[in-house]
Amino acid sequence: MLKQLENKKIKSEDIWIWDNNSTALALLAFYEQISTKYNLVKNNANYGPRFFAVPYIFDLLPDFFAVTDPDLSFNEKMPDNFLEYLKQLTIELSLFKAGLALDIIPTSNFNRELMSNEKCTVTEWEMQYWLFPITKYNNPKVFNAGIDTTFAVYNKKFISNGFYNAVRVADNFTCKHLPWYKDNIISEEEKNMLNTKWANWH
């Protein structure tokens, strides 16, 4: 993710890495390697993926900011000004956030048997986020669809709309969630790390 952000001309001093009290040795070693280049904040406990919405943290954030999980692969065709485009969508549509759609096209590499929960596959679950296009947007297409911690730009002005108040931008903005692909099968150690109350797929 860090390399992808740099390729989009995002300055390293504008990138903040928030760690939720990780114990994985490999990850801790990685933090040591990058701590002089990026802003690194270590929480003293695992507060979950939405900890930044807690008032005493949220109040410190700028009016517009972006949050992402690290396991996304950007679309190679996504424009370098994608942050500004997402920001403008939050203004035009009075939204808390605007983010990237997630690719669920069933390629041979896509793990179609991966379960999102006990009742449905990832594909079955994710279909709900492709049902409601906003007709005035065509290139790229924009869908009314909630976002948790997938890459999104946040507009603090509209936090009262609710945490999931969002749109997802498709076409050249559509990205891949790497754990859904067979060539990115995660290790048992990583599965154990993800197998918490915060995980929404397994």
Cite the ranges covered by each PLM segment.
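Short, well-formed alpha-helical segments that are part of the catalytic scaffolds
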Residues: 1-8
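Residues at the starts of beta-strands that form the adenosine-phosphate
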Residues: 13-14
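Acidic ATP/Mg2+-coordinating residue in the GHKL
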Residues: 19-20
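Active-site-proximal specificity loops/subdomain of glycosyltransferases
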Residues: 23-64
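Short beta-strand-to-loop acidic/aromatic patch adjacent to the donor-nucleotide binding site
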Residues: 62-77
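Conserved donor-nucleotide/metal-binding helix-loop-beta segment in metal-dependent transferases, i.e.
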Residues: 78-97
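Short beta-strand-to-loop element that shapes/binds the nucleotide-sugar donor at the catalytic cleft/hinge
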Residues: 98-113
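C-terminal catalytic/acceptor-binding lobe
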Residues: 119-202
